[in-house]
Amino acid sequence: MNKIFYTDGACSGNPGPGGYAVVSLEENELVYSYVEDFQHTTNNRMELMAILHVMKLAADDKENDYLVYSDSAYAINSITNWIYGWARNGWMNSKKKQVENIDLMQEIYQYVKFPMSNFKLEKVHGHDGLLGNELADSLASKNKQKYLNLIKKHNIIDF
């Protein structure tokens, strides 16, 4: 079975208070929702943590395929392209500086160094009307009214 997740991260101030959200919909039912908040973080860190959250779910569930949609080009490029070079170069970037979010990158690398056959990551455009992405965005950014409006407009069954 395919499980589809939408992830998003948000931050006010960058760095500042922020959070990330993960949602999964099946037809018109919200079947999974997770939100975590932090007092001092960055938007990129939140985007990475949201994707890492689903990686952990996929690693523990070999019976299902996980498709993750994210609107973060930074997170997707970091995880699918740059991370391998960073690992080879001692977690230094092309400017010979330590990569940002090294702790998360090293944890993510433990999942991607041997590709997970049941995990796929795809880029979507943010704020483009894609329901799952909009729900994740509203939860990550603490926009409760937007979330409730989306639930009502699309007749989503919220658990």
Task: Identify the meaning behind each predicted range.
Residues 47, 51:
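Short, conserved alpha-helix that lines the donor NDP-sugar binding/gating region
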Residues 10-14, 53-135, 139, 144:
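RNase H catalytic domain
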Residues 1-46, 56-61, 79, 138, ...:
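RNase H-like nuclease fold core
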